[in-house]
């Protein structure tokens, strides 16, 4: 048999050197074209366009070499003649950096700090400052276990359970943290799980075997109260279960773990320990209320997400507490900002019960300054100078309201996650982070060209807050894989925070690791009481039909609806979102306006913005102006209807179904969408859905089966795809039904709040245990974050102007 020969894997630089040596003229020609763009940043589509434009013979010579591979993996090229630096993404979360001298055709490898320093020259010119603040979290997590496979990203809890069970199997003493963890459980002074009769592992195993033997003699339905006193005498307290059967299951699981730990048993056991009774959910910005707020500035999907999340979470908590054999009423507090100028909403009310719950409330706390309470709405980009006093006040309010510390704090969006970090740090409780959207990815190059953005958006403070929160938190929930690590061709939201620079402030050489096991994908659903299939006739809310028909087809043009639909027999393509640049509603209108085939086939209805009042939001003002211009320029009246934002969620659910009755479709055209709750809502109603391929909807929709993915940067193609669909449906109506049914099936399999709630509480348990066993290891990073907060964030927050009352 031939002897196996090990060959060295050549570095990226070596492979590029080899290609340069073999094809100097062809590569020089290409790089010269890149250099001719002059100083600046070139994105992937620009680089590939230049490559496609070179002569076919020259291109063919490069096709089989490392150069094409590098080019397709390059996320940006920094051009500073004669140098071109490339940021090369080999796979999600794995990057390399090189630069090429176009004149000398020399390739140099760059470290992350060297690449960022080179990039800064776009703004600062050549600088000799060797003392730029560099932020590096890698040393604090180097000893933590992490997966290395791309498929493991977003499955952190599974990896963590495997690691913990392997560690526990190492020797008997490794079980001691589990014993200590079980002994610390109590609620308002009442001991749970184990009492002080059990001091060591030997006693624990002995007691568990005795309990197992006794429980096998009882009927499975025997109530815990029947043997509670007997268990107390041997060291076992309430929390194991409400019946003999459930208690026996728990005791057998623990005995199995003590004998031979495995990851599945560990997760199941930790998930059934009574740990979460009081939950605080932070969402300070916008108009947070249950009615008449959707469509207000900064008030959209996040509010819907939380108001759907909380009833499902409470139901799961009540179910678990009952099954644990406890008589405890859980509490959930949604903490938001109190707005004295509530403009016809309940945002000025301190405490408001959440609909459909027994023990959940919205708790509102005002922003205040030395001059008193701030009365008016403030943009989410301008909340930073108020956060510190707000967090102090929130700490006092939740302690008074709960009469206990929360067991879990969940942050939402940048300022909610910063608040959650500071509160969790102060109270020593488990923290969960939900970003919803990280603005850095929504505004390309807002880091390097910070000066162009900071006066309007104050990204210096926001990006700093994001870094603090994502590194402080115990676990992070995302709705999709793309939110963490993008796709084969696109960079993820969190991934974009791995390395970046804000010239004049600091460089981030290691901001986050997408392989960190704190990341978990837990997708939300839609409220099944509001969003159900159009075909369920007995549940349909036909009472709303006259209002909906008036909304869509009335000949009246006013502040609520502009333009009329002349042909009521056409299907309707429909969209509903906030009217801002990223949501791209005006983009959809432009695609429709410029496609005669689509205009002939269908009507277009857009719900977004509020023409009933003057907007204070600058982006909304700009988008409104653009919408008026499109209507006039393309003579859309007769085929198009622009409806002001609709705040009645119950009626909106029926609106989706009414559009389905017209054999229409829903379109979500955003330039980027972290998840896409409206996509889930539309699909839940059986409405065929076309949604952006930039972000979460690309994971929700299986193209051609449960809907269609569209590229918001290629509007002509998107419009043609829509036209093709409706032409096919005209010939074959079953095609519409097939896509509708495919969407419903997809939602039922993956996107429900029941699945979400079960997963969230299990995560809280596992990471609560992880926090307990690794508390000493986490201390260092938290001290580092304290310093970063005090020395950097506070100063940046103070630079944000206070609102003028």
From Swiss-Prot:
SUPFAM superfamilies listed in its UniProt record: UDP-Glycosyltransferase/glycogen phosphorylase
Superkingdom of the source?
Answer: Eukaryota
The record's comment on protein family reads: Belongs to the glycosyltransferase 1 family. Plant sucrose synthase subfamily.
Gene Ontology annotations of biological process type: sucrose metabolic process
Reaction catalysed by this enzyme: an NDP-alpha-D-glucose + D-fructose = a ribonucleoside 5'-diphosphate + sucrose + H(+)
- Which positions make up the signal peptide? none
EC no. given is 2.4.1.13
A Pfam family it matches: SUS_N
InterPro entries from the UniProt entry? Glyco_trans_1, Sucrose_synth_GT-B1, Sucrose_synthase_pln/cyn, SUS_EPBD, SUS_N
GO molecular function terms here?
sucrose synthase activity
Q: What does this protein do?
A: Sucrose-cleaving enzyme that provides UDP-glucose and fructose for various metabolic pathways.
Query: Gene3D superfamilies, per this entry?
Result: 1.20.120.1230, 3.10.450.330, Glycogen Phosphorylase B (3.40.50.2000)
Which keywords appear in this protein's UniProt record, sorted alphabetically?
Answer: Glycosyltransferase, Transferase
Q: Where is this region: GT-B glycosyltransferase?
A: 275-752
- Designated name of the protein: Sucrose synthase
